[in-house]
A protein has these predicted regions:
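Conserved N-terminal beta-strand and adjoining loop/helix that marks the start
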Residues: 37-61, 81
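Short cysteine-rich clusters marking metal-coordination/redox-active sites
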Residues: 17-20, 35-38
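Short metal-coordination and nucleic-acid-contact micro-motifs, chiefly zinc-binding Cys/His arrays
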Residues: 10-14, 31, 48
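Short functional micro-motifs and their immediate structural scaffolds
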Residues: 25-26, 43
């Protein structure tokens, strides 16, 4: 991401070197800080997150309504952050089970989109990895940070109803390719 897209330095809240604890931790470039004492450079890189695209035999997309901020009350797709030592495929499968009660039996990578995600007042930059997921079972159980789950015919899905920017853009992209996935 070019430097001009940042409104302020992404590490402005980080005042101490994570390696040695020094407060001589200054801006190195548009996405990193460098310690003036030990020389450590800390880069601000995106966090991996996954998004599940689940389409049933009626060409309906499984959507969730967010129960928590950010974008509480808006539509979303199942998914979330990957855990350490977890593959993206394992992460999307775990998130689908946590949020819907469904078991994923197959995943296929579709595409990725960058996103900004506000968590506890801090702007996280994520790389959202979209996966087509085939699931077992039909009983939907909204849980974790999901208020409601429902199936919407793909042709009726409106990108603007999705609260997170990357999900809305992903829906736009899906609507152009969903007949081929």
């Amino acid at each position: 991401m070019p430097a001009e897209q940042y409104k302020e330095h992404p590490l402005k809240l980080f005042g101490y070197c994570p390696r040695c604890g020094s407060n001589h931790f200054g801006i190195n470039d548009f996405k990193s800080k460098k310690c003036g004492d030990c020389g450590f450079i800390f880069y601000f890189n995106p966090i991996a997150a996954t998004v599940a695209v689940i389409v049933n035999e009626k060409n309906e997309l499984l959507v969730a309504r967010r129960a928590k901020e950010p974008a509480k009350g808006t539509l979303d797709l199942p998914g979330g952050f990957t855990d350490s030592f977890e593959t993206a495929e394992e992460g999307v499968s775990r998130e689908v089970t946590e949020e819907t009660g469904l078991a994923v039996k197959e995943t296929r990578y579709l595409f990725s989109l960058p996103n900004k995600y506000i968590y506890s007042g801090f702007e996280e930059h994520t790389m959202d990895l979209f996966f087509l997921c085939k699931v077992e079972g039909e009983a939907l159980t909204p849980a974790d940070d999901v208020e409601e789950l429902r199936w919407i015919p793909m042709e009726d899905v409106v990108p603007e109803e999705f609260g997170l920017q990357s999900i809305g853009k992903g829906i736009e992209k899906l609507k152009t390719i969903y007949k081929t996935i």
